């Protein structure tokens, strides 16, 4: 479903120097796989997710989604079906909330993609996400965890095939994190989730992609194998000295 091959991404910093952020990254993700993306701060996780969501494009190498090469040139032609298929819960939910009320927030995507019975879908989604009492509230007033839930509700309402999530548990308390995991299990769609929470990672998915701090792909395989391998964990700088 998702094929990334020899992908490179760089940017030019304020001194005019080229900084490589993703180097020679290759992996494949099959439909309905649940993949956990690990790596230290700045290793490139969010950037990789942005590439998978076609918010930025690779500098070299390829990203192929359902057999289509995703690149800047010609993206407009497929952007509508691509955006219906792939949803991205960004690291900061504020980036995703721009409507006057929670109701309008959930309605937005449903309208955009021409769903029928929008009212009914909004009610159902609100119920599923425990947002009924906030439907007329401006998202602006909500707590971080509640905003996260609204952002996720708006994305899931349009029934995407792929859900990309950047640190989804960062704002969530333990019961809401548990609820998120149940939801992901129930959704049963392709998911790629970046997280720093190794204790929870295994509940999010079985497979891990691990970026090293030199921006290459250090590991692609079973998450439980990675967590057992102290040498690799050390190389990824994901071991705690105070444990
Ligand atoms: N266009 C750009 N201009 C300047 N700096 C950039 C640009 N794009 C990315 N960066 C830098 O690249 C680095 C990698 O960013 P990214 O957000 O992908 O890392 P991350 O693995 O998600 O980190 P975190 O765990 O902190 O969320 C960061 O240091 C960021 O500041
Ligand atoms: Mg990030």
What are these regions (language model features)?
Residues 61-72, 82:
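Conserved ABC transporter NBD signature motif
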Residues 163-166:
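Catalytic Walker B motif of ABC-type/P-loop ATPase nucleotide-binding domains
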Residues 195-196:
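H-loop/switch region of ABC-family ATPase nucleotide-binding domains
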Residues 117-134:
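Conserved ABC ATPase "signature" region
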Residues 138-142, 146:
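Conserved ABC ATPase signature
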Residues 53:
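Helix-to-loop junction immediately C-terminal to a conserved catalytic motif
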Residues 215-239:
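Conserved beta-strand-loop-alpha-helix hinge in the C-terminal portion
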């Amino acid at each position: 479903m998702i094929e990334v091959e020899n992908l490179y991404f760089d940017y030019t910093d304020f001194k005019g120097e080229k900084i490589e952020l993703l180097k020679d990254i290759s992996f494949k993700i099959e439909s309905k796989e649940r993949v956990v993306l690990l790596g230290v701060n700045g290793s490139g996780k969010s950037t990789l997710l942005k590439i998978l969501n076609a918010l930025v494009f690779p500098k070299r190498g390829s990203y192929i989604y359902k057999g289509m090469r995703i690149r800047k040139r010609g993206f407009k032609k497929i952007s509508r079906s691509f955006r219906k298929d792939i949803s991205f819960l960004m690291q900061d939910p504020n980036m995703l909330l721009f409507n006057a009320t929670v109701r309008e927030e959930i309605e937005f995507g449903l309208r955009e993609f021409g769903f029928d019975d929008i009212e009914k879908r909004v009610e159902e989604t609100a119920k599923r996400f425990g947002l009924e009492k906030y439907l007329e509230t401006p998202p602006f007033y909500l707590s971080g965890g509640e905003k996260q839930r609204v952002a996720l509700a708006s994305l899931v309402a349009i029934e995407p095939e792929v859900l990309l999530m950047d640190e989804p548990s960062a704002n969530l308390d333990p019961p809401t994190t548990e609820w998120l995991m149940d939801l992901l299990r129930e959704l049963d769609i392709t998911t790629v989730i970046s997280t720093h929470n190794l204790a929870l990672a295994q509940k999010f998915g079985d497979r891990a992609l691990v970026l090293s701090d030199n921006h290459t792909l250090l590991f692609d395989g079973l998450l439980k194998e990675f967590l057992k391998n102290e040498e690799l964990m050390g190389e990824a700088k994901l071991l705690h000295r105070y444990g």
